[in-house]
Amino acid sequence: MGREVEAMPFLVRGMYFSGTGTTEKIVTAVAEVIARAEENFFRNPDIDFTPPAARKKPYRFGPQDVVVFGVPVIAGRVPNVLLPFLDTLEGNGAIAVPIVLYGNRNFDDALIELRNILQERGFHTVAAAAFIGEHSFSKVLAAGRPDEADIDVAADFAKAAAAKINAYVVDAAGEDQPLDEALEKILTEAGPVPVDGEQPLRPYYKPQDRQGNHINILKVKPKLDETKCTGCGICVQVCPMGSIKWDRPYVKVDGICIKCCGCEKKCPEGAFYFDDPGYLYHKEELELGYPERKEPKLFV
């Protein structure tokens, strides 16, 4: 009789940057379904690297890790403020499922950029996706997304990704392979997953007015209506750049703003607002120009 071989275990976790919670929603949905798909898949705690402190820690993985890795799209690319952190990741042969979430305009080169970063950091990307979420600037553009239909798509995507991952650890007859053979198969055969996007990467998307003039909103920051602020401190906690600080009895925006709008959308009193004319013009142009529902794009 041949020796009994146990299936190679996989440790599944989500890892995400999510200013308003939309990327988190998709990443966790995918990770949950992958973890339930096979008996040898096990759910591990997620890593939320939205808080600045979380991006100061080292993250090291190995060949038995499956990381569903999600970031939002900013200006058609991976947010440039995340690049130094992403360059510290150590995949060490881990499997990754890169996911980007965009606000109904276009994900441009964000997905291929994220895939390339993960590959360069030692991950094997075997499946990838671009999902849609409510635009950070707006409550109209892709309002309420990801919605129930998106979560259903995420579940189907996760099942397909799980089947692909598990195929690396079984032989042609569907029998579990010895651990060393399974690891070798992952290292030699897994990824990179083909995705949409251009190489070399295109420049960051720049908003324009209808005459083609560039609208610069890089230094735009939200303002605080002190008559509405109750000093609850939620904004201090949710700002991913650590740029909202106490200025008792209120708060002040004192640092880089990436316009994730977590402060504006999560403030229970609606105390944050934007009044920059260029920003408001660009927001309206997005709402008028991209009203049609877009659907997720999946790559397995």
Where are these regions (language model features)?
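FMN-binding flavodoxin-like domain, especially the glycine-rich phosphate-binding loop
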Residues: 3-14, 18-26, 30-47, 57-219, ...
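Iron-sulfur cluster-binding cysteine motifs and their immediate structural context
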Residues: 224-226, 230-258, 262-280
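Conserved SAM/SAH-binding loop
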Residues: 51-54
